[in-house]
C-alpha cells in the first residue's frame, strides 16, 4: 500500500512560505506607585488656653503593603520598614537621637468617630508619646478602610460591638524601648481604638 506524507519543504512537496512568529505574545507594564498625600493641619485649644497644633497627612495606600486590612499581631518587628516608609522614602529622615529607637504604631479607630474626636485622640497620643520621651512624632491618616476580618470589642460599659471597617492612623516616632509597653496598655484600654500594634523599624542594609 502506497502512502505519501509531506515532511519537508522540497520541490516535490513545497510548504507555504510562512514567517516564523511566536504563537503567543505577552506584554506587561508595571506602573510605579505614586503616593497621593493631602497634608492637613488643625489647631486645638487646650485647657490652659494655649493651642496645640496637630500635624497629619492623608495618604492613598492602594496597592501597597497595608492594602486589605490590619496585619498580624504575631510579628512585633516591622520587616525592613513598612509600606508607609516605602511611600515616603524620598523624604529625608531625621537622625535617631542617642538612646532612642524608631517605631511605628498602627491604630484602628472606630469608624463613626467625628473629625473633632479623631483630632482630639491624635493630640492625646502625640502628647503621650512626647511625655514618654518620644521625638519627631508624625501622624498619617489613611481614612476609613474595610478590615481584613471583623473585630469584636467590648467597651468599658460592657457593650460588645462588631466592626467591619475602621479609621487607620499611623504614628511614626523615635522613643525609648521601655516606653512601648505602657503605650500599648493605654491603646488597648481605649474604647475608641479597635486594634493597635507597634513595630520597631529595621533599617535596610545596602551592599
From Swiss-Prot:
One of its GO terms (biological process) is translation. Keywords: Chloroplast, Plastid, Ribonucleoprotein, Ribosomal protein, RNA-binding, rRNA-binding, Transit peptide. It is found in: Plastid, Chloroplast. Pfam families: Ribosomal_S6. GO terms for cellular component: chloroplast; chloroplast thylakoid membrane; nucleus; ribonucleoprotein complex; ribosome; thylakoid. Residues 1-59 form a transit peptide. Residues 77-86 have a biased composition (Low complexity). It comes from the Eukaryota. The keyword Protein transport does not apply. One of its GO terms (molecular function) is mRNA binding. Gene3D superfamilies: 3.30.70.60. Residues 69-99 are annotated as: Disordered. Coiled coil: none annotated. The keyword Ribonucleoprotein applies. InterPro entries: Ribosomal_bS6, Ribosomal_bS6_sf, Ribosomal_S6_plastid/chlpt, Transl_elong_EF1B/ribsomal_bS6. Binds together with bS18 to 16S ribosomal RNA. Belongs to the bacterial ribosomal protein bS6 family. Part of the 30S ribosomal subunit. This is Small ribosomal subunit protein bS6c. It comes from Arabidopsis thaliana. The lineage of its organism: Eukaryota, Viridiplantae, Streptophyta, Embryophyta, Tracheophyta.
